Amino acid sequence: LDNGQHILIGAYTETLRLMRCVGVDPEKTLLKTPMTLLFPDGNGLRFPAWPTPLDALAGIATARGWALADKGSLLRVATGWQWRRFQCDPTLSVAQLCQNLRPRVMAELIEPLCVSALNTPAQRASAAVFLRVLKDALFGVQGGSRLLLPRVDLSELFPAAAARWLAERGGQIRLGSRVASVLQQGARWQVQGESVDAVILATSASEASRLLSQSAPTAADATAATLRQWAHTTSALTFEAIATVYAWGAGARLAHPMLTLRSNATQPAQFVFDRSQLGGPPGLLAFVVSASNADPQTLQAQVLQQARAQLGLTLQAIQTVVEKRATFACTPGLRRPAQHLAPGLIACGDYVDGPYPATLEGAVRSGTAAVQGLSL
């Protein structure tokens, strides 16, 4: 069972391109639906399958449960964002950016969007990054706002196919082989005793920081200082957790593959997914809790109560998966580590400096840029 129930959107152009490149058909592996932020009571937004940005305008105009004043406040504020080309003071939080929006708009649109895109609550999430995500989703490619929900697990969505693609072309994949250090040898690098032209660090932030801290003493003075500073910047990142509570109920089925939930301190899940509509067994639901530091037992009990209160379902807990360092905290003015460390040494990952938060698309674009950087 995956953790986090990954959501892709149509604006993930590089992810979709790379999937096709390695032989994965997005039409078969992803369920495509219009942008939907509907609650169990039927209120919320649902974009029609219209051209960009008419889909967003229509979704706002027809939002269920919203007063005319709610819709008007969002249109006024969003027009201002567009007028300013979706740019703002980098020190602003999403909550500060949206302070003129009405409470319902914040609760039923901004907060769910923010926590799903940045995995950071609006009170401490970067407004600048949030606006970049909105710009690409709502005003980028046609269909950029459409939800793409995986029908297969994450390994089959890309990594397994990518490994097969590489092997078919003569690439070597060495599993279970931990790298202790990366040694500089003039214009080359040594990894596990093997001399190579270049190294791309495609690891977690903590592992990359450890590796470069151990490698710095053997590098040339200028490179050593860069590696130490990079490791320091990376180790200073803070992280947010993601938890997924899997629960089952006989005959349990949602009106849509994904529903938004009203979240608070005692009802922590922000989204629920109907796994039966995404290739899973009947009756299995997945509740996703982003940016929470509660223990698994507490989360599980709270989510089961939330299911009774908001969905009217009495469910049996199957498994609770918690990843404490799932994504970096995407806060205002955050300093992220650079991609280029030294000639022939490049880092990539969703945490590396870039315009996006910790998303699949951010990671894929970072990897693509790293490969392109080797040829510069």
Regions found by a protein language model. Give the residues of each.
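Conserved flavin/dinucleotide-binding core of flavoenzymes
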Residues: Q270-L376
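Mid-domain catalytic core of redox enzymes
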Residues: S177-L299, Q305-Q310, P337-A338
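Local beta-strand N-terminus motif with an aromatic residue
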Residues: Q5, E27, V196-D197, L315
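Mobile amphipathic helical/loop "lid" adjacent to a hydrophobic cofactor/ligand pocket
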Residues: Y12-L131
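A short coil-to-beta-strand element that immediately follows conserved catalytic motifs
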Residues: T29-L31, R174-L175, I242, L311-E323
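Conserved N-terminal glycine-rich FAD pyrophosphate-binding loop of Rossmann-like flavoproteins
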Residues: L1-I9
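Helical element adjacent to the flavin cofactor pocket in flavoenzyme catalytic cores
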Residues: V133-W189, D197-A198
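Short glycine-/acidic-enriched loop or helix-start segments at secondary-structure transitions
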Residues: L18, R210-L212, P217, C330, ...
